[in-house]
Amino acid sequence: MINDISDIAYRIEEISDTRITLVRDAVNRTFRNGGLLIRCLRPTLSIDYAFSAAPNDYIRRFLSCPALARLVPELQPMTPLPNDLTIVPLGRYTLEGEIVQLLLANGMYADSEFDVRMAPSAATNFVDALIGDSKSSVHRVDSHWADWFDGIEWNSITLIVYTDRKWWLICAFDTD
Protein backbone atom coordinates (compact mmCIF):
# COMPACT_ATOMS: atom_id res chain seq x y z
CA MET A 1 0.00 0.00 0.00
CA ILE A 2 1.43 3.37 -1.05
CA ASN A 3 1.07 6.21 1.42
CA ASP A 4 3.17 8.90 -0.27
CA ILE A 5 2.05 9.72 -3.80
CA SER A 6 4.01 12.94 -4.16
CA ASP A 7 6.84 11.36 -6.16
CA ILE A 8 4.86 8.89 -8.26
CA ALA A 9 5.16 9.21 -12.02
CA TYR A 10 1.96 9.65 -14.03
CA ARG A 11 1.04 9.66 -17.67
CA ILE A 12 -1.77 11.63 -19.27
CA GLU A 13 -4.33 9.49 -21.02
CA GLU A 14 -5.84 10.80 -24.22
CA ILE A 15 -9.47 11.84 -23.91
CA SER A 16 -11.38 10.86 -27.02
CA ASP A 17 -14.77 9.91 -25.60
CA THR A 18 -17.28 12.24 -27.26
CA ARG A 19 -19.38 12.38 -24.07
CA ILE A 20 -16.44 14.16 -22.45
CA THR A 21 -15.22 16.21 -25.40
CA LEU A 22 -18.76 17.53 -26.07
CA VAL A 23 -18.86 19.11 -22.59
CA ARG A 24 -15.25 20.32 -22.75
CA ASP A 25 -15.67 21.96 -26.14
CA ALA A 26 -19.02 23.59 -25.28
CA VAL A 27 -17.70 25.13 -22.05
CA ASN A 28 -14.52 26.29 -23.81
CA ARG A 29 -16.63 28.12 -26.39
CA THR A 30 -18.58 29.82 -23.59
CA PHE A 31 -15.69 30.55 -21.17
CA ARG A 32 -13.57 32.39 -23.75
CA ASN A 33 -11.22 34.09 -21.28
CA GLY A 34 -10.67 30.99 -19.21
CA GLY A 35 -11.88 27.60 -20.19
CA LEU A 36 -12.44 24.03 -19.11
CA LEU A 37 -9.36 21.92 -18.61
CA ILE A 38 -9.89 18.15 -18.29
CA ARG A 39 -7.01 15.75 -17.76
CA CYS A 40 -6.93 12.06 -16.95
CA LEU A 41 -3.74 11.02 -15.18
CA ARG A 42 -2.80 7.42 -14.45
CA PRO A 43 0.15 6.26 -12.34
CA THR A 44 2.80 4.56 -14.47
CA LEU A 45 3.29 1.89 -11.80
CA SER A 46 0.71 -0.57 -10.60
CA ILE A 47 0.11 0.83 -7.13
CA ASP A 48 -2.60 0.60 -4.55
CA TYR A 49 -3.50 3.79 -2.67
CA ALA A 50 -5.05 3.86 0.77
CA PHE A 51 -7.19 6.65 -0.69
CA SER A 52 -10.38 6.01 1.25
CA ALA A 53 -8.53 6.32 4.56
CA ALA A 54 -7.50 9.95 3.99
CA PRO A 55 -8.87 11.38 0.72
CA ASN A 56 -8.12 15.03 1.54
CA ASP A 57 -4.50 14.19 2.26
CA TYR A 58 -4.17 12.27 -1.02
CA ILE A 59 -5.79 15.09 -2.97
CA ARG A 60 -3.40 17.63 -1.43
CA ARG A 61 -0.46 15.39 -2.33
CA PHE A 62 -1.77 14.87 -5.86
CA LEU A 63 -2.28 18.62 -6.45
CA SER A 64 1.22 19.39 -5.20
CA CYS A 65 3.11 16.50 -6.82
CA PRO A 66 5.89 17.52 -9.23
CA ALA A 67 4.44 15.25 -11.93
CA LEU A 68 1.24 17.30 -12.10
CA ALA A 69 3.20 20.52 -12.60
CA ARG A 70 5.22 18.85 -15.40
CA LEU A 71 2.28 17.16 -17.14
CA VAL A 72 -0.16 20.07 -16.90
CA PRO A 73 2.17 23.10 -16.88
CA GLU A 74 -0.59 25.56 -17.79
CA LEU A 75 -2.10 25.09 -14.33
CA GLN A 76 0.98 26.40 -12.52
CA PRO A 77 0.11 24.77 -9.16
CA MET A 78 1.13 26.75 -6.10
CA THR A 79 4.01 25.34 -4.12
CA PRO A 80 3.42 24.88 -1.36
CA LEU A 81 -0.34 24.60 -1.49
CA PRO A 82 -2.26 26.97 0.78
CA ASN A 83 -2.78 25.56 4.26
CA ASP A 84 -6.45 26.50 4.17
CA LEU A 85 -7.21 24.46 1.04
CA THR A 86 -10.88 23.46 1.27
CA ILE A 87 -11.73 20.03 -0.14
CA VAL A 88 -15.38 18.98 -0.17
CA PRO A 89 -16.58 15.42 -0.84
CA LEU A 90 -19.31 15.09 -3.47
CA GLY A 91 -21.55 12.31 -4.67
CA ARG A 92 -22.06 11.22 -8.26
CA TYR A 93 -25.28 13.23 -8.64
CA THR A 94 -23.69 16.34 -7.17
CA LEU A 95 -20.92 15.95 -9.75
CA GLU A 96 -23.59 15.78 -12.44
CA GLY A 97 -25.11 18.96 -11.01
CA GLU A 98 -21.74 20.73 -11.12
CA ILE A 99 -21.40 19.79 -14.80
CA VAL A 100 -24.97 20.95 -15.52
CA GLN A 101 -24.10 24.29 -13.89
CA LEU A 102 -20.99 24.61 -16.08
CA LEU A 103 -23.03 23.85 -19.19
CA LEU A 104 -25.76 26.36 -18.34
CA ALA A 105 -23.45 29.14 -17.17
CA ASN A 106 -23.04 32.03 -19.51
CA GLY A 107 -19.48 33.18 -20.03
CA MET A 108 -18.40 36.78 -19.73
CA TYR A 109 -18.73 37.25 -23.50
CA ALA A 110 -20.66 34.22 -24.78
CA ASP A 111 -23.92 32.55 -23.86
CA SER A 112 -24.30 28.85 -23.17
CA GLU A 113 -25.23 26.57 -26.06
CA PHE A 114 -27.29 24.37 -23.72
CA ASP A 115 -30.77 24.75 -22.32
CA VAL A 116 -32.26 23.25 -19.15
CA ARG A 117 -33.42 20.14 -21.02
CA MET A 118 -30.15 19.36 -22.82
CA ALA A 119 -27.63 20.08 -20.04
CA PRO A 120 -28.69 17.33 -17.56
CA SER A 121 -28.51 14.67 -20.25
CA ALA A 122 -25.06 15.81 -21.38
CA ALA A 123 -23.88 15.92 -17.75
CA THR A 124 -25.14 12.39 -17.05
CA ASN A 125 -23.37 11.12 -20.17
CA PHE A 126 -20.19 12.98 -19.14
CA VAL A 127 -20.17 11.40 -15.67
CA ASP A 128 -20.96 7.96 -17.14
CA ALA A 129 -17.89 8.34 -19.37
CA LEU A 130 -15.73 9.31 -16.39
CA ILE A 131 -16.78 6.74 -13.84
CA GLY A 132 -19.41 4.43 -15.31
CA ASP A 133 -20.42 1.93 -12.65
CA SER A 134 -17.04 1.86 -10.91
CA LYS A 135 -16.46 2.87 -7.33
CA SER A 136 -15.17 6.40 -7.27
CA SER A 137 -14.32 9.28 -5.00
CA VAL A 138 -15.44 12.75 -6.09
CA HIS A 139 -14.29 16.01 -4.51
CA ARG A 140 -14.46 19.73 -5.19
CA VAL A 141 -11.59 22.05 -4.25
CA ASP A 142 -13.05 25.35 -3.05
CA SER A 143 -9.77 27.23 -2.77
CA HIS A 144 -7.31 28.93 -5.11
CA TRP A 145 -4.51 26.37 -5.60
CA ALA A 146 -3.12 27.13 -9.08
CA ASP A 147 -2.17 30.31 -10.90
CA TRP A 148 -4.15 29.20 -14.00
CA PHE A 149 -7.29 30.50 -12.28
CA ASP A 150 -5.89 34.06 -12.20
CA GLY A 151 -6.82 34.32 -8.52
CA ILE A 152 -10.51 34.10 -9.37
CA GLU A 153 -12.40 32.05 -6.80
CA TRP A 154 -15.88 33.43 -7.43
CA ASN A 155 -16.09 32.04 -10.96
CA SER A 156 -13.90 28.94 -10.90
CA ILE A 157 -14.15 25.30 -9.96
CA THR A 158 -11.88 22.31 -9.51
CA LEU A 159 -13.35 18.83 -9.48
CA ILE A 160 -11.27 15.75 -8.75
CA VAL A 161 -12.46 12.23 -9.43
CA TYR A 162 -10.41 9.22 -8.38
CA THR A 163 -11.60 5.99 -9.98
CA ASP A 164 -10.11 2.82 -11.43
CA ARG A 165 -6.56 3.81 -10.45
CA LYS A 166 -6.72 7.09 -12.31
CA TRP A 167 -7.26 10.73 -11.43
CA TRP A 168 -9.61 12.98 -13.37
CA LEU A 169 -8.83 16.66 -12.95
CA ILE A 170 -11.56 19.05 -14.11
CA CYS A 171 -10.87 22.78 -13.81
CA ALA A 172 -12.91 25.69 -15.14
CA PHE A 173 -12.98 29.47 -14.87
CA ASP A 174 -13.93 32.56 -16.82
CA THR A 175 -13.10 36.21 -16.36
CA ASP A 176 -13.50 39.50 -18.17
Predicted features by range, described:
Residues M1-F114:
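N-terminal "domain-start" segment
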